Curated annotation (Swiss-Prot):
<keyword id="KW-0547">Nucleotide-binding</keyword>
<keyword id="KW-0173">Coenzyme A biosynthesis</keyword>
<dbReference type="GO" id="GO:0005524">
    <property type="term" value="F:ATP binding"/>
</dbReference>
<dbReference type="InterPro" id="IPR001977">
    <property type="entry name" value="Depp_CoAkinase"/>
</dbReference>
<dbReference type="GO" id="GO:0015937">
    <property type="term" value="P:coenzyme A biosynthetic process"/>
</dbReference>
<keyword id="KW-0808">Transferase</keyword>
<protein>
    <recommendedName>
        <fullName>Dephospho-CoA kinase</fullName>
        <ecNumber>2.7.1.24</ecNumber>
    </recommendedName>
</protein>
<dbReference type="InterPro" id="IPR027417">
    <property type="entry name" value="P-loop_NTPase"/>
</dbReference>
<keyword id="KW-0418">Kinase</keyword>
<dbReference type="GO" id="GO:0004140">
    <property type="term" value="F:dephospho-CoA kinase activity"/>
</dbReference>
<keyword id="KW-0963">Cytoplasm</keyword>
<dbReference type="Pfam" id="PF01121">
    <property type="entry name" value="CoaE"/>
</dbReference>
<comment type="similarity">
    <text>Belongs to the CoaE family.</text>
</comment>
<dbReference type="GO" id="GO:0005737">
    <property type="term" value="C:cytoplasm"/>
</dbReference>
<feature type="domain" description="DPCK">
    <location>
        <begin position="3"/>
        <end position="194"/>
    </location>
</feature>
<keyword id="KW-0067">ATP-binding</keyword>
<comment type="pathway">
    <text>Cofactor biosynthesis; coenzyme A biosynthesis; CoA from (R)-pantothenate: step 5/5.</text>
</comment>
Length: 194
């Protein structure tokens, strides 16, 4: 089994690439999905986040993701606080999913991890696949498709490693500055070369 580390900045198109790789037969371990699972009601991380950040619980006890994001990405210190609470739990759950992937019989496991490089998890994978798009295009996508305001989009991008560092860590780069169809053609070409 080959393990692919799929990464890229917010708004780069990782989800599109991950979906296509799943269609092609890869076993996907999605760190963002794991991150959502670990903050569901009743999970210890949710209580810790509520203690660390003011007003991040909805009246029904679920996480107010928008408010958490607003606070957590406001300063590097706040981002570090968020990461200290969530990342150890994400790592533990992803290890469970890696085991499931190995046992599934799939030939390719894709670790869809936005912070693969920042978190020093490159050594977990055999090949680093980076989805890349210029920052301004990513900002436009975040504003138009995810409903973020421009300043929030810029803050989130600034909280991640710079594009050059990400590209330098890549074994393969998929250029998502064009159409979705062009991106999917690149994914299919990558898959065919495995």
């Amino acid at each position: 089994m080959i393990t692919i580390g799929l990464t890229g900045g917010i708004g780069s198109g990782k989800s599109t690439v991950s979906s296509r790789l799943a269609e092609l037969g890869a076993f996907i371990v999605d760190a963002d999905l794991v991150a959502r699972e670990i903050v569901e009601p009743g999970q210890p991380a949710l209580a810790e986040l509520a203690d660390a950040f003011d007003g991040v619980l909805n009246p029904d006890g679920t996480l107010n993701r928008g408010e958490l994001a607003r606070q957590a990405f406001a300063t590097p210190e706040a981002t570090e606080k968020l990461n200290a609470i969530t990342h150890p739990r994400i790592r533990a759950r992803t290890e469970e999913l890696f085991k499931q992937g190995r046992e599934s019989g799939a030939q390719v496991l894709v670790y869809d991890m936005p912070l693969l490089i920042e978190n020093g998890e490159v050594d977990k994978v055999d090949h680093v696949l980076v989805v890349d798009a210029p920052d301004e295009l990513r900002i436009d996508r975040l504003v138009q498709h995810r409903g973020l305001d421009e300043n929030d989009a810029r803050r989130r991008i600034a909280a991640q490693i710079d594009r050059a560092t990400r590209l330098n860590a890549a074994d393969t780069v998929l250029d998502n500055s064009g159409t979705v169809e062009q991106l999917l053609e690149q994914v299919d070409g990558f898959w065919g070369g495995l």
